[in-house]
Amino acid sequence: QEENKSCKSNNLIVAISTSLEIKNIEIASITDTKCHIIRFQLQTLEFDIIGNYAQAENLRKQILSKIREIVKKYDIQCIHMVISSSVAFTFFLGAGFSSQHDPNVIVYHYDNGKYIWGIDMKRNGSDAVIIP
């Protein structure tokens, strides 16, 4: 579901939940700027709920399609991604992004109720570490 539709920001927060729910306060821990927000959450949240390649591919297509629609609609320059899912699905999703055609993506690491740091996917070395 899309939130903050009237926002004038060129930043998009993408919250993907397949294992645990991502709470608003956790999203707020990565930025104090009002951003566009899109949430993807399965009806049933469980660890390793994505059972096969077809399910993973279907979910990835839905997510990437909606992200790209919003990127185009609002001229998004940076995607801030928070994910509560299996490592396997997280990497599978990441492989679907294009460094040529998609905007900058920062993926955040969750620890004890907050997303405390992130990795900017278009930077190298220590320049890639983002502390919100």
Name each model feature, range by range.
Residues 1-80, 87-132:
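Long, low-complexity, Lys/Arg-enriched
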